[in-house]
Amino acid sequence: MSTLERIDPEIADVICEEEKRQRGKLELIASENFVSEAVREAQGSVLTNKYAEGYPGKRYYGGCEFVDMAERLAQERAKKLFDAEYANVQPHSGSQANMAIFFAVLQPGDTVLGMDLRQGGHLTHGSPVSFSGKLYNVVSYGVRKDTEQIDFDQVARLAREHRPKLIIAGASAYPRIIDFARFGQIAKEIAAYLMVDMAHIAGLVCSGLHPSPVPHADFVTSTTHKTLRGPRGGLILSHSNYTRLLDSQIFPGIQGGPLMHVIAAKAVAFREALQPSFKEYQQRVVADAAALAQELKALGYRLVSGGTDNHLMLVDLTPQGVTGRVAEETLDKAGITVNKNSIPFDQQKPQVTSGIRIGTPALATRGILPHHMKAVAGFMHRGLKSAGDEPALARLRAEVAEFCSAFPLFS
């Protein structure tokens, strides 16, 4: 019996059941992944006990000599990984990294140009329910109806018309390569700051499988999980002339003590991402996504923009007469985890949606390869066709669990 089982059997049971879920189901949520045992070990270490307000060498607490070493390693590895002059590894999340940029260069009421949430953007890019939409004047761009790819003519027109102080590039549900150089040109034309949120594609960027935003943006933010396959957390990259401005916005601006156990885990993840094997992993992620997209199209599914260039795709279920919410619930019963997602120009409410977003980072981590995507697409197709048929879904769930057992986790 473990210490946790003895002290708190209820939480121990929750963790046990969640591990079973992760082992036995196909994880197709594009923003989820499985960290290495080394990352988990660092995050569960004694570093969780240490307060360390401030930055290495400039702390407000004593006894920080070793956590200073951990944070410096994380900073240097992040800079090397993305060829950046500056890295702040303290943000607790991608949203807080974004908030720090807003607070650093904007005043309440300033104009921001960001991607519409319902066309692929993120809550923190100007949604009215987010701080970004509540404190600032937000103008939103989207995608073209014919290609379902970013409408750069619209971006340029809105930029010239509204003269935003900050332009945001990056997305949470966009399956194509983003032209950061073009965003940079538009921002320079109107003397705006450019912030790129690369949370979803950071792993692809550091592996050379997606163009880097670092040369074109004033600020780059990211999460450290998703394709980067680290602990849940945030990251800011920038140029050295912004060091004091950005450091002060994270602490004491919006955060107090950093999570040193998470920062150590970030350092481990960055070291893993610097290895040649990580690029090979990212190549599998992209190859898996391309193969899965092809198999789904062969089964009659319409993909937003016609396919994918990265790790994710959006499936429009309108032709199948199924909502995203029903698809998410049905596939979960079949042992397949996805999330409902709005598609461009969606007529359904955000709680319902016409589509699902799926991705392959977690599949590739398990060792599931492109030639397995025919089976994965087949499982999805059978699940969606079995909506409401509980016995059929139960049988399919058993098949999916058997399939997953060939690709063990946490070995």
Curated annotation (Swiss-Prot):
EC number(s) stated in the UniProt entry for this protein: 2.1.2.1
- Biological process terms in GO annotation: glycine biosynthetic process from serine; tetrahydrofolate interconversion
Q: Which terms are listed as keywords in the entry?
A: Amino-acid biosynthesis, Cytoplasm, One-carbon metabolism, Pyridoxal phosphate, Transferase
InterPro entries for this protein? PyrdxlP-dep_Trfase (IPR015424), PyrdxlP-dep_Trfase_major (IPR015421), PyrdxlP-dep_Trfase_small (IPR015422), Ser_HO-MeTrfase (IPR001085), Ser_HO-MeTrfase-like (IPR049943), Ser_HO-MeTrfase_PLP_BS (IPR019798), SHMT-like_dom (IPR039429)
Q: Which CDD domains match?
A: SHMT
- For the modification N6-(pyridoxal phosphate)lysine, the affected residues are 226
Q: Which GO terms describe its cellular component?
A: cytosol
Task: Give the residues the record marks as binding (6S)-5,6,7,8-tetrahydrofolate.
Answer: 117, 121-123
Protein origin, superkingdom: Bacteria
GO MF terms here are:
glycine hydroxymethyltransferase activity; pyridoxal phosphate binding
Q: Where is the site labelled Plays an important role in substrate specificity?
A: 225
Give compartment(s).
Answer: Cytoplasm
Please state the pathway this protein functions in, per its UniProt record: One-carbon metabolism; tetrahydrofolate interconversion; Amino-acid biosynthesis; glycine biosynthesis; glycine from L-serine: step 1/1
State the reactions this protein catalyses: (6R)-5,10-methylene-5,6,7,8-tetrahydrofolate + glycine + H2O = (6S)-5,6,7,8-tetrahydrofolate + L-serine
Q: What class of enzyme is it?
A: transferase
Q: Which cofactor does it need?
A: pyridoxal 5'-phosphate
The role this protein plays is:
Catalyzes the reversible interconversion of serine and glycine with tetrahydrofolate (THF) serving as the one-carbon carrier. This reaction serves as the major source of one-carbon groups required for the biosynthesis of purines, thymidylate, methionine, and other important biomolecules. Also exhibits THF-independent aldolase activity toward beta-hydroxyamino acids, producing glycine and aldehydes, via a retro-aldol mechanism.
Q: Which family does it belong to?
A: Belongs to the SHMT family.
Q: How does it assemble?
A: Homodimer.
This chain belongs to the protein called Serine hydroxymethyltransferase
Organism, scientific name:
Syntrophobacter fumaroxidans (strain DSM 10017 / MPOB)
